[in-house]
Regions:
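A membrane-periplasm/extracellular boundary helix in multi-pass inner-membrane enzymes
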Residues: 162-169, 232, 257-294, 313-315
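Flexible juxtamembrane loops connecting transmembrane helices in multi-pass membrane enzymes
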Residues: 178-187, 271-308, 333
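Alpha-helical transmembrane segments of multi-pass inner-membrane proteins
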Residues: 109-113, 148-175, 189-256, 363
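Transmembrane alpha-helical segments and their membrane-water interfaces
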Residues: 41-46, 83-98, 106-164, 254, ...
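Transmembrane alpha-helices of multi-pass inner-membrane enzymes
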Residues: 14-20, 380-390, 397-424
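Hydrophobic transmembrane alpha-helices and their immediate junctions
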Residues: 100, 247, 255, 263-264, ...
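N-terminal signal-anchor transmembrane segment
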Residues: 2-90, 113-115, 387
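Long extracytoplasmic/lumenal interhelical loops at the membrane interface
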Residues: 293-353
């Protein structure tokens, strides 16, 4: 494709992204406007670069659904499998198509089976798994350009969300303080999901910075800007889980790298110093508020919830519930003490889909490590460590939050590739 067409596509999708960023309406756009936007978004990339559709969809969808305003991207996960399936038609022209990992197929069948039996309907978590399966067909594991493009789009996603947050910080505080507001945009109203989504872009930026094949000025600048701006936004978001997940993921990545000890010490010292500076600045009102709320239960509220839910799971129900769980959102109502959010994907999946479901999820997380080569193993483990730590304080997979499924797809893309020529 000529440079003129490439520049035209770049300008076109920049305008589409800008149209999302500047939205400030608190009422959802009409269905026709949403349909027109989605087709305008999907058709050009599918016609010219279908292999880049997964990265584009995950990035733009994450920005659109993590906005404080309503945007053109639907919050209902039922639409995304249809969009992904539509794009596969364009892949027929290409001989490069991948088979979805069997673990994803098996896990999605289990989820569908349990949800139909327990809830008599298909739930959003299955739609997200189905979208992940369909998007995995697009991957060409031998294409270096596809992996680099995925990294770039995750960086763009983090920068866009951070910019929206930093320029609308007061709007977020108003939404967060209204417990009864009923905000549909859960990612925006919950600083934990918002922070972890931005953290994905930071991890991707580090991949970009550590890759010898992407060492030109543009990639360096994009990576540095993503790390600096996104970390500032994450501190302001005051998500303790997101900050801890990012810190440990980065620490492992630096610690296991092949760079000199001197460089490791310098990098870690800079990260610690930068974080401490932000934590002691005057822009952490929300973090101070959230920390002060922990004094009521000594900071052990989540551990109490996990213990209560696990006791209820193992001491009630039938053998079917023990093996296959209570279905989507079953963990929320498990026990006799009312509605409680779990704040842990492992506990939630155990209660929702039983020991079988939890076992499949654990193998799904191990699968990228199993298939990767030695040169990519450090980066794959670091990315998985970040994702696993996010799952320890949130419920991204059991709740069907598509951005986290997209990040897992990115990890698969890295794991199945040949040597990426990383400095690590």
């Amino acid at each position: 494709m000529g440079k003129i067409k490439l520049c035209s596509l770049f300008i076109y999708y920049s305008v589409l992204l800008f149209a999302i960023i500047i939205m400030d309406n608190l009422e959802a756009p009409g269905i026709m406007l949403r349909i027109i936007y989605l087709f305008s978004f999907a058709l050009p990339i599918l016609m010219f670069f279908p292999q880049h559709f997964p990265a584009m969809l995950i990035a733009y969808m994450s920005v659109g659904t993590n906005h404080f305003a309503f945007t053109y991207f639907p919050y209902d996960m039922n639409y995304y499998p249809l969009l992904a399936a539509l794009g596969i038609v364009f892949l027929k022209r290409s001989s490069v198509k991948s088979r979805p990992p069997q673990i994803l197929l098996l896990f999605s069948v289990l989820i569908l089976f349990v949800d139909i039996i327990t809830n008599d309907r298909v739930e959003s978590v299955f739609c997200s798994f189905l979208t992940l399966i369909l998007l995995s067909v697009y991957l060409n594991y031998q294409s270096h350009n596809q992996k680099v493009f995925f990294v770039i789009m995750l960086c763009v996603m983090a920068l866009a969300i951070s910019f929206i947050y930093l320029t609308n910080y007061k709007d977020f505080l108003v939404i967060y303080s209204r417990v009864d507001s009923g905000v549909e945009r859960g990612g925006w109203s919950d600083p934990n999901y918002l922070g972890c989504t931005v953290g994905m872009g930071v991890m991707a930026a580090l991949v970009l910075l550590m890759n010898r094949a992407t060492s030109n000025f543009f990639y360096r600048l994009l990576g540095i800007l993503t790390v600096c701006i996104s970390v500032i936004a994450m501190v302001l978001m005051a998500s303790r889980g997101a900050l801890l997940s990012l810190a440990l993921g980065v620490f492992y990545l630096v610690l296991m790298s092949r760079t000199s000890k001197k460089n490791k010490i310098v990098v870690i010292a800079c990260l610690i110093g930068f974080t401490l500076y932000l934590m002691n600045s005057s822009y952490v009102e929300l973090l101070q508020y959230r920390l002060s709320t922990e004094s009521n239960d000594g900071g052990n509220g989540r551990f109490w919830i996990w213990q209560f839910k696990l006791d209820a799971f193992f001491n009630s129900g039938t053998i079917f519930n023990f093996l296959f769980g209570y279905g989507y959102n079953g963990a929320l109502y498990l026990g006799d003490r009312g509605y409680w959010a779990i704040h842990n994907d492992f506990v939630a999946l155990l209660c929702d889909y039983g020991l079988v479901g939890l076992s499949l999820f654990l193998y799904m997380l191990y699968y990228p490590i199993k298939i990767t080569n030695n040169e990519n193993k450090v980066i794959v483990i670091a990315l998985l460590l970040y994702l696993i730590l996010c799952c320890c304080s949130l419920e991204p997979f059991s709740a069907g939050r598509l951005p986290f499924f997209g990040f897992y797809l990115f990890i698969l893309c890295i794991a199945k590739s040949k040597s990426l020529n990383y400095k690590i």
